């Protein structure tokens, strides 16, 4: 098995033994369920785009909470040096931690599938294609936010600070697509391309655009590599 996948499997299993993980899952699902109850079920609306948009907003807090301890916790406990001396490349370690956190996100999204099922049961009706692309878009956006969270966690041993850094960076790329009323249209047309909303919107409309897939993949790779470079530079400083 690929070393990164082995690391991911171990990290994912450990996360599922933590009460904190289930608390975070519960808060996210409760918030999402409340939105579904107030919109789709209460108003009889079959379109889940509004719910997906709210879930995207919740990611700003949910994903940093999942990732804040991925590296920062090990640094604070003094086990990071031990991990980095294992017969694994730093890239395998970082990608393993990323995949584990992304796996947690996929797990909670799988649990949230109960909401479109409830909408269908109560007779509102849903579009399976739009549900599929909506969840695919959330997974792609979630990958980018997860990579940002891993990078933030690599910067410090303080988990709260890692959460704040991840939240701040994520909020910036989230808000770039929502500045239309504050800046000139020509400037906004350029800036909004770097916002997650711009690329998630196609998925929520039921369209899979390879350009959006590439953008999310690029953001994910950039921040995972930044986390790797951060750990490499730290190791070099310690060797000196």
Residue ranges and their predicted role:
Residues 17-38, 54-63, 168-172, 222:
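Hydrophobic alpha-helical transmembrane segments of multi-pass membrane transport/permease proteins
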Residues 63-67, 115, 147-148, 226-227:
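Hydrophobic/aromatic residues in alpha-helical transmembrane segments
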Residues 162-236:
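Terminal transmembrane helical anchor/hairpin motif
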Residues 47-50, 66-84, 98:
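Transmembrane helix boundary and interhelical loop/hinge segments in multi-pass membrane proteins
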Residues 1-21:
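Aromatic- and glycine-rich beta-strand/loop motifs that create alpha-glucan
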Residues 53-73, 108:
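Long, hydrophobic alpha-helical segments
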Residues 35-37, 43, 58, 100-160:
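Secretory targeting signals
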């Amino acid at each position: 098995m690929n070393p990164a996948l082995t690391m991911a499997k171990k990290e994912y299993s450990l996360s599922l033994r933590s009460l904190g993980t289930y608390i975070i899952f519960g808060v996210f699902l409760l918030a999402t369920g409340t939105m579904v109850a107030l919109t789709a079920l209460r108003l009889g609306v079959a379109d889940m785009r509004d719910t997906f948009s709210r879930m995207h907003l919740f990611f700003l807090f949910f994903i940093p909470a999942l990732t804040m301890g991925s590296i920062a916790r090990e640094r604070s406990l003094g086990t990071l040096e031990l991990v980095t001396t294992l017969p694994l490349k730093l890239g395998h370690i970082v990608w393993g931690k990323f995949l584990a956190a992304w796996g947690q996100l996929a797990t909670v999204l799988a649990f949230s599938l109960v909401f479109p099922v409830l909408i269908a049961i109560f007779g509102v009706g849903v579009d399976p294609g739009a549900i599929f692309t909506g969840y695919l878009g959330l997974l792609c956006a979630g990958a980018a936010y997860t990579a940002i969270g891993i990078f933030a966690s690599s910067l410090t041993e303080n988990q709260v600070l890692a959460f704040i850094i991840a939240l701040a960076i994520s909020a910036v790329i989230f808000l770039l697509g929502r500045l239309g009323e504050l800046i000139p249209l020509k400037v906004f047309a350029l800036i909004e391309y770097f916002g997650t909303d711009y690329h998630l919107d196609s998925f929520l409309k039921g369209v899979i655009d390879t350009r959006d897939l590439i953008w999310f993949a690029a953001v994910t790779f950039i921040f995972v590599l930044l986390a790797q470079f951060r750990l490499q530079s730290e190791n070099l400083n310690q060797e000196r």
